[in-house]
A protein has these predicted regions:
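Metal-coordinating catalytic core of metallo-dependent amide/deamination hydrolases
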Residues: 1-15, 19-20, 27-140
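Alpha-helix termination/capping residues and helix-transition junctions
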Residues: 23, 95-99, 148-151, 170
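Active-site-adjacent C-terminal substructures of enzyme catalytic domains
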Residues: 129-130, 139-196
Length: 196
């Protein structure tokens, strides 16, 4: 649906969601790409986020999440997709000033630690702040990388160990718990209660 929608159609839908959140008291939110996973759709989504941000009254923090999942057309060419994100997409969105952050989903079902390192290292070189979807389904899938790279946040962390949480604290990485994901996707909340 996102790939087929026009920029104006996405803007209308985004306004609806923004207005609903504003009605609930939200004054600042993060909006991520990552549902198009090709150049045109990622740029379209980020330009919609910029337009919505310019309208106000809600402050929107734009984040590139092209490393959310490997798109079907790259199923057998993962490395090519990772290189494209790191070497082409990130420089383009950074040069256009479309994002403040770059996020990557580091997990068995998404991107490996090395693939995530490639994407986030490129983002860091281009002046973007970092976020990592980390240790959501299995420990050791991204939180240590978040600490190593000095990410702003490590998100999810349902399976993070106490040692990993301590490394995040020592590195100044803010852990972010996403309760909706926790309760919708995982029967065990692991270390989430201790983080909160």
């Amino acid at each position: 649906l996102t790939r087929a929608a026009t920029e104006d159609e996405l803007l209308v839908a985004a306004r609806r969601h923004r207005d609903w959140m504003l009605w609930g008291g939200t004054t600042t939110l993060e909006a991520k790409s990552g549902y198009g996973l090709d150049r045109d759709t990622e740029l379209k989504m980020l330009r919609v986020i910029r337009r919505l941000n310019e309208e106000g009254p809600v402050r929107i923090v734009p984040t590139l999440l092209a490393a959310h999942t490997v798109p079907p057309e790259y199923k057998d060419r993962r490395g090519e997709y990772v290189r494209w994100v790191a070497e082409e997409l990130i420089p383009e969105v950074a040069a256009e000033g479309l994002v403040q952050y770059c996020d990557a989903f580091c997990d068995d079902h998404a991107f490996t630690v090395e693939e995530t390192r490639t994407v986030l290292s490129a983002a860091k070189r281009h002046g973007l702040k970092l976020r990592v979807h980390a240790d959501q389904f299995r420990p050791g899938t991204g939180a240590d990388l978040a600490a190593e790279l000095g990410a702003a946040t490590a998100d999810h962390l349902e399976t993070a160990t106490d040692e990993t949480l301590e490394r995040l604290r020592a590195a100044g990485v803010q852990p972010v718990v996403l309760p909706g994901s926790v309760f919708a996707l995982t029967p065990e909340t692991g270390s989430v209660h201790e983080i909160a």
